[in-house]
Regions:
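Structural and coupling elements of P-loop NTPases
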Residues: 1-687
């Protein structure tokens, strides 16, 4: 098998559009399975995880290799739910072409829009699915696609629609033939006489689209005003590859209508790996280079997905150059390790079929690669390259996670690490300041699924709560206080006495310590103990126990005992001075402020700005993107952002995205300060 015999196809689109059902029908139609599974029955090839079956949604990228007319079509079924967009990015990384799947009754879905945007310049085609269902409206759906994506939209079929707007047969505009489904198979039928004019007009439009992709074809079309099916296919393939043409097909994954035509279109129009431009990469010295798809070159492959579950661990690779065989040793430039490869597999759902090699342009799995992660490159040690991985979105929704019992703490950590191998889009941070383990992902569904997997796979009952905000405390006035520590226990005692001036400063967050002692009232050898006592005291402020920042402390006087004084005594004396001074120094809470950049369609600008006002946000600017969207920049307190990922999704019908990064601390308004102090006290009492 060569790259010319392979097509790598990502199925993308809105959740519920029927991507998994389409993959299932493709398998069934090509004898890849002996029965047609259904999502509602929980028996499809691609949705095999317990959570997928329970929720009836796709959660992970799944693979359905289809053999059609001697060509291997690697169908990659990506989740449509936005919480699992990272899985779609992995599919896009491995695919040369995407099929965007939409439901005929949904018109232009948000998932279709976002998938189109995620693809960048990668080739694509559209399959309007579920045309056999009530309320389906192919015409409205097509109009919406043309309105959004413009002249690239090129229907290559004309549906035969009954009085209920259901599609009963399909006209192939390329070959001027029609098909219906009989007994689960495509069967030729006559083009309805009343559609003759419509079909002729649509074929003329398709010829024009094909001719527009190639100068030679354009001249031929202008000379004769006609193109053969072969010429049309040639032009459309060029247009698909350069992005000027997006073919549109339709049908039903449930009945099989239009599915074989889609398979044929993938064969005819989808590019192969060697059609694609060279990939950006780096050499061993970090220099930017280009790596072309080359079956005869030194081996290079990208790990675009890791499957780690009860069935084992598989590293999914796409071979960019050369060939991968099971007896190879390949170099991983990320870790510096040379990896001896184990068995190779072709994945179909949860099952892996062993194979001897994976050729250039193909995808497959390597078993039991414990030190290899998603995004790593595996290459020939004498020709080291680092291929570009996946640019996953920044996690934007966080929850604190903890086990119900202390005995499960270690199991929780192990489980999260294992799940992170499979899904690198979520992050885990052990926050030493708030004493919480915080898990961050794309949204609440992703976090909920991770908790369910912790339970079923690792036996950990995890609890979620709101992450605590890391406030700071500072003072606003200058105070001088004495700290005197004296303790007598029988013989020798403990004695330390300090006078310290506490004042605000703006030079740095860390405390500035100075000593201005005259006459030896405090010996110099005790200065470090005083400083240490103050720095330790700064870890717990007097308002709510948060770290104290922007503080200057100057040791100005004190006294000592030649026998009883010690470093520990002066350290404790400094602590007493700190505790006495800060309540009188007008302490105030400081809250973390972050920079928010939210990208939204123009129509939602008013709602989003109004919501930011409620969150105490300050709008800093707006920048139009040029495609009907705005990037709104604002500064918002972190305490007001805990549910923003969910709220923005609701406000914008999932069309809004955002990034949020900490920039600085600011004084907390009185009402917010009172609330934060009350929460801190309640937490301290509970613990």
């Amino acid at each position: 098998m060569t790259a010319n015999d392979i097509r790598n196809i990502a199925l993308l689109g809105h959740g519920g559009s029927g991507k998994t059902s389409l993959a299932e029908q493709m398998l069934f139609m090509t004898k890849g399975t002996d029965r047609l599974g259904r999502t509602a029955d929980g028996n499809t090839t691609c949705d095999y995880d317990a959570e997928e079956i329970k929720r009836q949604i796709s959660i992970s990228l799944a693979f359905a290799p289809v053999n059609y007319k001697g060509v291997k079509i690697n169908v990659m079924d990506a989740p449509g739910n936005f919480d699992f967009s990272g899985e779609a990015l992995s599919a896009i990384r491995a695919a040369e072409c995407a099929v965007l799947v939409g439901a005929a009754k949904d018109g232009l879905s948000v998932g279709m829009e976002r998938s189109w945007k995620m693809l960048g310049k990668k080739p694509r085609m559209i399959f309007i699915n579920r045309t056999d269902e009530d309320n389906s409206d192919y015409a409205s759906c097509l109009d919406a696609l043309k309105g959004k994506f413009g002249q690239a939209i090129a229907p290559i079929v004309a549906p035969v629609i009954d009085g209920n707007k259901k599609v009963t047969a399909i006209v192939d505009l390329l070959h001027n033939t029609a098909y219906e489904v009989k007994g689960g198979k495509a069967a030729a039928c006559a083009i309805p006489a009343d559609m003759a004019d419509e079909v002729e007009a649509l074929r003329a439009e398709l010829m024009e689209a094909a001719a527009g992709a190639d100068e030679e074809l354009m001249e031929k079309f202008f000379d004769t005003m006609e193109l053969s099916a072969q010429d049309m296919a040639k032009g459309l393939k060029i247009g698909v590859r350069d992005g000027s043409v997006c073919p549109v097909l339709c049908g039903s994954a449930n009945t099989g209508l239009g599915v074989e035509m889609l398979l044929q279109t993938i064969l005819d129009l989808a590019p192969v790996a060697t059609d694609m431009p060279a990939e950006a990469a780096q050499d061993d010295d970090g220099n930017d280079i280009q790596v072309a798809f080359d079956p005869n070159g030194p081996t290079a492959a990208i790990v675009f997905k890791t499957i780690s579950d009860q069935y084992g661990k598989y590293s999914m690779i796409k071979v960019i150059r050369g060939k991968v065989t099971g007896d190879m040793a390949l170099y991983n430039p990320t870790t510096g390790n040379t990896e001896k490869l184990g068995r190779l597999y072709v994945m179909k759902g949860k099952k892996g079929e062993e194979t001897k090699d994976i050729c250039c342009g193909d995808i497959g799995a390597i078993g039991k690669m414990d030190k290899v992660k998603t995004g790593d490159t595996l290459c020939d040690a004498k020709n080291i390259v680092r291929l570009h991985g996946m640019d996953y979105a920044q996690p934007c929704y966080s929850r604190a996670i903890s086990p119900k019992t202390k005995q499960e703490i270690e199991k929780l950590g192990t489980g999260l690490n294992k799940l992170n191998e499979e899904d690198p889009t979520f992050h885990v941070v052990n926050n030493a300041e708030t004493h919480q383990t915080v898990i961050s992902g794309a949204g609440d569904i992703q976090i909920d699924v991770l908790c369910a997997k912790l339970k079923t796979r690792f036996g950990v009952d995890a609890e979620l709560s709101a992450p605590r905000v890391a406030y700071r405390e500072k003072i606003r006035s200058t105070v001088r206080k004495q700290g005197r520590y004296k303790k007598q226990t029988g013989g020798s005692g403990q004695f330390g006495d300090v006078h310290i001036i506490f004042e605000p400063q703006t030079e740095q967050e860390d405390m500035i310590f100075e000593e201005n002692v005259f006459g030896g009232s405090v010996p110099k050898n005790y200065f470090p103990a005083v400083e240490k006592g103050l720095r330790e005291s700064c870890q717990h402020g007097v308002l709510a126990g948060y770290p104290v920042v922007f503080l200057k402390a100057t040791l100005v006087d004190g006294s000592y005992h030649p026998v009883d004084s010690s470093e520990i005594a002066f350290k404790l004396a400094a602590n007493l001075a700190f505790k006495a001074a800060l309540p009188e120094a007008k302490p105030v809470l400081m809250e973390p402020i972050g920079e928010l950049k939210v990208t939204i369609p123009d129509s939602y600008l008013g709602d989003v700005m109004g919501d930011l006002n409620k969150r105490r946000g300050r709008v800093m600017g707006m920048n139009p993107t040029g495609d009907g969207e705005q990037v709104l920049e604002a500064e918002v307190p972190m305490a007001e952002m805990m549910s923003y990922a969910i709220d923005l999704r609701s406000m914008t019908q999932s069309r809004g995205t955002f990034t949020f990064n900490f920039v600085r601390y600011e004084d907390c308004p009185a009402a917010a300060q009172e609330k934060a102090i009350a929460e801190a006290k309640a937490l301290a009492e509970a613990e």
